[in-house]
């Protein structure tokens, strides 16, 4: 398990889906762009998915703590929105 911390800008629409089978009820998937212009796909489940869908939108800046999975995507464990001044 690889824990990572990322800060970036949301560059895609947040795709929210309900899951029929499995341990999770819902998922939110979107992409962020970090400072060096790398684009990373991130995903959150259940409560985090609800927060992402209801509170975030394209062009928001976020800080994420997550787990790097085998596909190179980040599964969000904690997330916080911030603004640049």
Model-derived regions: residue spans:
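Single-stranded nucleic acid-binding surfaces, predominantly the OB-fold ssDNA-binding core
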Residues: 1-85
């Amino acid at each position: 398990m690889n824990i990572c911390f990322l800060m970036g800008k949301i560059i895609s629409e947040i795709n929210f889906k309900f899951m029929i089978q499995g341990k999770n009820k819902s998922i939110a998937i979107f992409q962020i762009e970090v400072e060096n212009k790398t684009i990373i796909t991130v995903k959150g489940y259940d409560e985090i998915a609800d927060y992402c869908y209801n509170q975030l939108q394209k062009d928001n800046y976020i800080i994420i703590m997550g787990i790097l999975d085998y596909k190179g995507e980040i599964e969000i464990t904690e997330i916080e929105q911030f603004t640049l001044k």
